[in-house]
Swiss-Prot record:
Protein name: Holo-[acyl-carrier-protein] synthase
Highest taxon of source: Bacteria
UniProt: Mg(2+) binding residues: 8, 57
Function recorded in the entry: Transfers the 4'-phosphopantetheine moiety from coenzyme A to a Ser of acyl-carrier-protein.
Source species: Caulobacter vibrioides (strain NA1000 / CB15N) (Caulobacter crescentus)
A single MF term (Gene Ontology): holo-[acyl-carrier-protein] synthase activity
Family to which this protein belongs: Belongs to the P-Pant transferase superfamily. AcpS family.
Length: 133
């Protein structure tokens, strides 16, 4: 059963400006270590960061809170499954909100789709509750 849907469109140029202006201060405040490591290896790091930023915004919308009630950008991170498929790893207030959304006897699955076409990056998140196995 689908329990949350969120999408976001991010202007890559805005992320480029934040990277130029604030550098590590920006990346360390907003992105997880895993996200920073992956993005810094990319030839177009601004695009990589923008997709991850859009994913965080989309996830916060799927959680039904936006960036409020203890849900912060740094508490949501893009990770990859062994297959390479992206998903979200949540901590802190974001994880607590996710747990509160999931009906008893179910477990959450977060589906994430990322794309970019300069100057935009887009993310779409679906949170699904499935019976525990």
């Amino acid at each position: 059963m689908i329990i949350g849907i969120g999408s976001d469109l991010c202007d890559i140029r805005r992320i480029e400006k934040s990277l130029e202006r604030f550098g590590d201060r920006f990346t360390h405040k907003v992105f997880t270590e895993t996200e920073r490591t992956r993005s810094e290896r990319k030839p177009d790091r601004a695009s990589s960061y923008a997709k991850r930023f859009a994913a965080k915004e989309a996830c916060s919308k799927a959680l039904g809170t936006g960036l409020k009630r203890g849900v912060h950008l740094a508490g949501m991170g893009v990770v990859n499954l062994p297959s390479g498929q992206p998903t979200m790893a949540l901590t802190g207030g974001a994880l607590e909100r996710l747990k509160a959304m999931v009906p008893e006897g179910m477990e959450p699955v977060i589906h994430l789709s990322l794309t970019d076409d300069h100057p935009y990056a887009q993310a779409f998140v679906i949170i699904e509750a499935l019976p525990k196995r």
